[in-house]
């Protein structure tokens, strides 16, 4: 059975009582629960611990696998927010990927519109230069409501640019909220570029994009079939847990998700034919 590198997104570490959990506490929890890696958001106030991030592998045995950011593809080349993304990317530990949602400040541009593909390509090129120097990747992150909203949008850009450092993220929640059907086709089409996956429990009629974000052992979305499809298509990369807005007892929620994930892995190892359910 293939063993994925497992991480938790930093969205898992926030609730209404504590706010955002301290970096060192996050690391301690992840190690105790059997995670392999940590994941951060790429923003100035979220990188005040950048020096500690560089020491994370030695201190905790955790990889800093990726950082999340948004990039406005309509903004001018010298846009300060876009420039900040590039600057912060360069401060990350070597090998730490940038997972990037492509947005637009022009509300007249519809999600997935191919009319601004050329602008997206233009904005991505300098970040790919940084990725090469950092020995890392830029991974396109489909996100509900963003210009890059669908898996197929990321595939289109990867195919057009043909850059070895440009990859794709499959976000279970955002796929469920935006598309929610033809999962096998989405995965198989993405596989040539797929470098990262994040998953969570989810049900319809929630407050976020019409769906909920929950620990992995709850909700209506069939994450076992998703994991089976990934294995059938040969995906061996990292898999993480999304936790935006869950709140509550962070440790318990992560423990539930990890237990559910390991249970699904075990089922697939015992019944490999079950990977063909969809």
What residue ranges belong to the model's regions?
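Conserved beta-strand positions in the central sheet of alpha/beta enzyme cores
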Residues: 39, 66, 97-99, 139, ...
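Active-site acidic/histidine proton-transfer and metal-coordination neighborhood
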Residues: 78-168, 177, 252
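Active-site mouth loops of central-metabolism enzymes
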Residues: 7-22, 70-80, 109-117, 215
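Active-site-proximal loop/turn and secondary-structure-junction residues that shape catalytic pockets
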Residues: 13, 44-46, 70-73, 102-108, ...
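Histidine-acidic metal/acid-base catalytic patches
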Residues: 1-11, 15-31, 121-125, 129, ...
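Catalytic domains of carbohydrate-active enzymes, especially glycoside hydrolases
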Residues: 22-46, 94-96
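Non-catalytic positions within long, well-ordered alpha-helices that form the structural scaffold/packing
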Residues: 31, 58, 90-93, 132, ...
